[in-house]
Amino acid sequence: MFGKIIGTGSYAPDNVVCNNDLKEFFETDDQWIRERTGIKRRHIMTDESTSYMACRAAEKAIENAGISCEKIDLIIVSTVSSDTVLPSTACIVQDQLKATNAMCFDINVACTGFITAYNIAQSYINAGLVETALVI
């Protein structure tokens, strides 16, 4: 059995910070930042929590996939900025989505987080342990 991506979703905080907003703090300018990072602007959390943002992205992905939350067997959240140590962000997402049939856990692997979580989900699917995974 092989898995495939059936829906995607995203969420970004409303607070946008451009490079020029940072030039005094970092004693640099927009051009220097762009040349080295490619970043023009970033979305910064103010009142949002990691689990809040994960839930908003998940809701969009679930809607895009055209499935119900009850169909989800596995939730994996990759983050280095959890709301709390316990419960895991994935457990908070599971509760908020009412995805009562899902096993869930977080992984903490920074930049390679999505591909690592995707590979774990794919392994669970290939082994026949789950049918539908939510990777955040």
Give residue ranges: language-model regions.
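Conserved "HGTGT" condensation-loop signature of ketosynthase/thiolase-family condensing enzymes
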Residues: 1-73, 97
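Conserved catalytic cysteine-centered active-site region
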Residues: 34-36, 40-52, 79-133
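Short glycine-rich or small-residue beta-strand-to-loop segments that form or flank ligand, phosphate
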Residues: 73-79
